[in-house]
């Protein structure tokens, strides 16, 4: 059993004793903690909290515990049940609620679940709020309601449709062009909530030909749910058979979007955001943001339009903070996460699909041809395992000193920008390791510079 408590929420494997896994005792504790925090921080007069969940097998159990606890804390619960992460985020603002809890472990296997915590803006808690959650949980500073002040319960299953309504209302979503293009689309929804909302989205976008793979929301994931090439053999083979113009693949909570070209070749998750940004910038010039570990291609595309690109620390809340500070019109993360402020400040695969199909319809190209129009970069992802007694921060400081003549960014680990490549070093918050991401114009060059930096780290660790 595993239970991980962090500033972004609580996640773990289902079962075990108190503090060992994600079980009812720990769910009650952290729901109570969140309810206590939101009571202090919410500026609204609302007494509502929204609860949504992906299709995990444990979801119904976890939801029932969360809902009962919130009512016991005096909160009025709006249960939107099976819903994507972006749907739940939008529901918070549409309801005028004080916050929301999303029950999803994102791309983790079916034995995992988690509580992801939202503020009154439908955005994830910041670091200070996350730390306060951990403090309240440790101190067990809870105050439950008396019998006359218990919260109420309301189920509302309209938010999937409301989410789609909001996507279709976006100025840059060109439904007429998509209908005219008569696309054939394949989808893999890994037997979670994407299987509910993606077919409805595509139908309302005017896509008449949809090949559905793993669209039953049973929570029995048909493959590893992270939308990476090594896990997507079935839909890649379907595409090689010439059955569709493009394939969309989402993770269990539908905040990440991967795509597959008409020839069965992966589009590249780093290029989901790059492509959508190209379309957005063409029509609404402005700044862009992605995290330090994302492809340089977004910077290149942004500069093509004479706009400014900025990098944030890794993590959605950090990307959103930087986007607000720089008035970015589009941003996100290189794992297929598209954040479009005209919709809301959260990664949203539905927005990504609608904008991508609009762009594809306007360009009149095959998906593989569109992909070829963007700068070719390759990212290598590695790690250096260290012993617990080694001072990781000291090693990162020494690496920074060694490469002081290069462009350095140290807002999140150390990123070294060379003229034609980069390397990003980040320490793990939970393990004695350093993650090493490197990018260059060929995979060989990316691996080479990554290995060079890893050799430096290993040499420093021996001293």
Tell me what each language-model feature is.
Residues 36, 48-112, 200-260:
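N-terminal small/polar loop signature for handling phosphorylated ligands or for N-terminal nucleophile
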Residues 51-54, 187-189, 261, 342, ...:
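Short glycine-centered, acidic/aromatic-flanked micro-motifs in structured strand/loop junctions
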Residues 244, 284-463:
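Phosphate-binding and adjacent anionic-ligand microenvironments
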Residues 131-165, 169, 261-334, 338-339:
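Proline/glycine-rich low-complexity loops and linkers
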Residues 117-120, 258-262, 339-341:
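Short beta-strand-to-turn element immediately C-terminal to the catalytic PLP-Schiff-base lysine
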Residues 1-68, 72-73, 152-184:
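An N-terminal, well-structured beta->alpha segment
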Residues 13, 113-240:
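Gly/Ser/Thr-enriched, mixed-charge loops and adjacent short helices
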